[in-house]
Each structure stands twice: as structure tokens, then as C-alpha cells.
């Protein structure tokens, strides 16, 4: 399924969706004119080591959970994948004859932010122990743009189906 761009979607998701749609339009337009193949790998929230000082947006969320800049969590579910698994998928997609022309979701698990905070606390970090109640988040969202952006995702279980990727790419 495609991200519904008629909804209130973050610029990041919009750019990713449009880029992939352009890829498939390009491939269709050049079908039979080139031997080029395409595969789309759509990772969920990517965590893991960074090769540079830029830790990336996903790792920044964890950093903010443990550095005290987030005093509470919101009950938001995210799907997660390790950077090494994403790299392995890219490699496998290049050498697997069943991959061309397909779209794959890279996701290993899903967790709500309070669960993530608990895992961090259980491993010696000082993540928030409080979850902001939904009613209070909705009130604060009127004044805080960051909280407002996440309101549509509070208390919603989202599980990305990566079965296709696991079946074909391993």
C-alpha cells in the first residue's frame, strides 16, 4: 500500500513516497528499452551504529529518551529494524533473482514508546518512567507542534508486514 498523500503526512514520508512512485513510473516508461532492474526497500524506524557523527533521526529519538530532553513518553507504536538488517536486505536484493520489480518492508519488531523506555531503564539508562496521558497530550498538542504532529498516532497499534521480505530475501 502507498502512503495516502492527501492526509496530513510529514514531508519525510511525502518525499519517500513520491521518490518511489517516480522510480516505478520511470521503470514502466522504460520497460523493454533497458535491462535495468529496480527493487524498493522501505525500512521502518532504523536503529543501530552510525558511521559518522550524524546519528540519524531514529537514533536521535533514543538519545532524547536517555538525555532527559523528553520528560515523558507518548503511547505511540513504532516499527523498528536494525541498520545491519537493512544493509543485508540491500545486498540480498542485488543478488536474488526473485527481488527485481518488488517492494519490501524492512521491519523486525514493533514497540510502544513506554516499552522502549522500559527496555532502556532495564539496561541502566535513565529514560522517562512516565507516559503522558492521551487526554493531556491532546491538550498540549494545541500549543506544541511536535506533540500535535504525533496525536494521530497515539494509542494506535501499527504492525508492518515484512513477510514478503523475509520470504524472498531471508
List PLM regions with ranges.
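Substrate-positioning beta->alpha
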Residues: 57, 72-94, 102
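Active-site loop of classical SDR/Rossmann-like NAD(P)-dependent oxidoreductases
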Residues: 113, 149-162
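Mid/C-terminal beta-alpha module of Rossmann-like enzyme folds, strongest
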Residues: 89-148, 167
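A conserved pocket-lining segment of Rossmann-fold NAD(P)-dependent short-chain dehydrogenase/reductase
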Residues: 3-8, 52-53, 59-81
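Glycine/proline-rich active-site loop of Rossmann-fold NAD(P)-dependent oxidoreductases
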Residues: 32-35, 48-61, 93-103
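Active-site Tyr-X1-5-Lys
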Residues: 5-38
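Conserved sequence/active-site signature of Rossmann-fold short-chain dehydrogenase/reductase
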Residues: 46-48, 86
